Amino acid sequence: MVAIAAAVRAGRRDPVAIVAGVAQRHAAIHPAINALIQPRFEAAAAEAAVIAAGPLAGVPASVKECFGVCGLQTTLGIPGRAGLIDAEDAAIVQRLRAAGGVVIGKANLPQAMYLHETDNPVWGRTNHPRDPGRG
């Protein structure tokens, strides 16, 4: 993170290209992993295009699904909450953005954040990246 932000601030890395690289990687691994369940790469690229400063300048970051991100759902993996769209960012997301971070989407979580295994009826199971047979 530190190296990415320093390179963006110095003009050596393009934050839009960084987001594009993350989007490519997501496309390759998402079917097996199912970790980033609400991607927002187009919006993230547009935001990255105007970021050049801050301690997290241009650093792509996912946000756990329990935190509000304007325009995305916060379901906690509970079917009755599906479809409800956040009207504003949670305080932690506001701080992330203020520091120059680029929100690429929301990451899956256990239903109601109750268990240790990430699986819920809204977004499904997230698998271990090195052993997709495990959750």
Language-model segments: which ranges?
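Long amphipathic alpha-helix in the N-terminal Rossmann-like dinucleotide-binding domain
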Residues: E42-A49, G100-G101, P110
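Short secondary-structure boundary/hinge segments and terminal tails
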Residues: H26, A44, A112-L115
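Aromatic/hydrophobic pocket-lining residues that form the small-molecule binding cavity
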Residues: P15, A44, D89
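Short glycine/serine-rich loop/turn segments
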Residues: A57-G135
